[in-house]
Amino acid sequence: LLPNGESRTTSRDFADMVQSQIVGDLQMQFDSLWSRRSTWDRSYRESRTPSSPSMLLELLSHQNFADMKYGLDPSFRFAVSRAVYKGMLKYLSSRYGTAYVVQPLPVGSMGVSFSKDGNKAIISWKPACDPLEPTADPSGYILHTRVDDGAFDRGVKIKDIKRGNDRLYTEIDITPGHIYSFRVTAYNDGGRSFPSETISIGLPVTADLSEKILIVNNFDRVSAPAFVDTPIYAGFDNRIDSG
């Protein structure tokens, strides 16, 4: 029994809910044939002696090439980590009989530009919806600001949000002669998302607003290293793409 008198078989429910969440999410996002592997009931000290429900998770084998084609992909790792979090959350919801809300996904496609008079920065982003989890919709956004080499502030809830072209916008006053950096996080009753990428903007004291420069972040895609998979040999080739 657990210290509170509850049966340790609740750990079986815990493991089942986390595994079900992982398998379901991976089948939806990466491989519809992703198999559900065995759940063991073994006397491992790490999961047998804790004073709270516990489980051990072994998802991939570093000696399995098919596994590592996924395991080295950052987007796959994020999906698995989020699935573990959602499985834990749903277990706690079931155990205590309370509703749950999943934290939002990070916003994407961040952008910033000057207003026509140059006195404001126009910050824009695309909201991220989680098709696997309807409770993860954001209820609002928080703007974090840094001036020059200072630290980011603790964030301010954005009250004035405009919409257009599938994007959300807000404006903030800026002073020439300083560099402003911004991050946006989404929030709901389940918590805050991870922060967006950092975007920066600045206007010299003497500036010509008639000239414009467009800077595009073209490095927002992630992947595993390039691989070769033939009947003769298989493996990763970092010479082509290290991921």
Predicted regions mapped to residue ranges:
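Pro/Thr/Ser/Gly-rich low-complexity, intrinsically disordered linker/stalk tracts
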Residues: K90-D137, P176, G190-E211
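Beta-strand-rich modules
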Residues: T170-R192
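Extracellular low-complexity, O-glycosylation-prone stalks/linkers
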Residues: D130-K159
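Aromatic-Pro/Gly-enriched surface loop or interdomain linker
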Residues: T198-G243
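Active-site-adjacent mobile loop/cap segments within catalytic or ligand-binding domains
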Residues: F30-Y96
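Short S/T/G- and acidic-enriched coil/turn segments that sit immediately N-terminal to beta-strands
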Residues: G164-T170
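A short, glycine/acidic-enriched catalytic loop
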Residues: L1-E6
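Active-site-adjacent substrate-binding region
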Residues: S7-W40
